[in-house]
Amino acid sequence: MNFIYTLQELISALENCSNEEYPTVLKNLQLPYNELTPYESWKSKGYTRNCIVRTSKYELVLLCWNVNDATPIHDHDGQKCWVYQVKGSISEKRFDFKNENLVETLCTNLSPGKLTYMDDKMGFHVLVNNSNDRATTLHLYMNPIDFCSYFCEEEKVFKKKTLQYDTVTAQKEVTL
């Protein structure tokens, strides 16, 4: 498989492969930052979730992170999740729930071009922009994800949350 340099090439590859081939497609991903800038949106506080494409098979979401933005510790409602670091640096911490406590099992930093994978069998994770600049990450979910469970720090329990987008790109705008 050839390297993938554009968003249109990525979408075409995802549309024309089986779900089992997603890891191979993503390992060939070399998207430059400017490919995704049209899909960015920012707010003064907190990260944004920007839907680029959503089909019955998958969903591509661009997350835009301000300095110190972080997700809560969360799962993916049984879906598989790949995170491709587009710009900046994000740290990922993974957790297992043991003896009614969350235990950190891994901490890694993602730099541009790096890819990470997560599913619920691996536990839970949190993503944090602990760099000194904004960051963007491209998330591929197989299948689309509508809910997740997140860890409520105040109550020390997991709660279910409906996921929302800050922006949605009409699929017809992404030309194949």
Protein language model regions, located:
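Asparagine-centered strand-capping/turn motif at beta-strand->loop junctions
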Residues: L127-S131
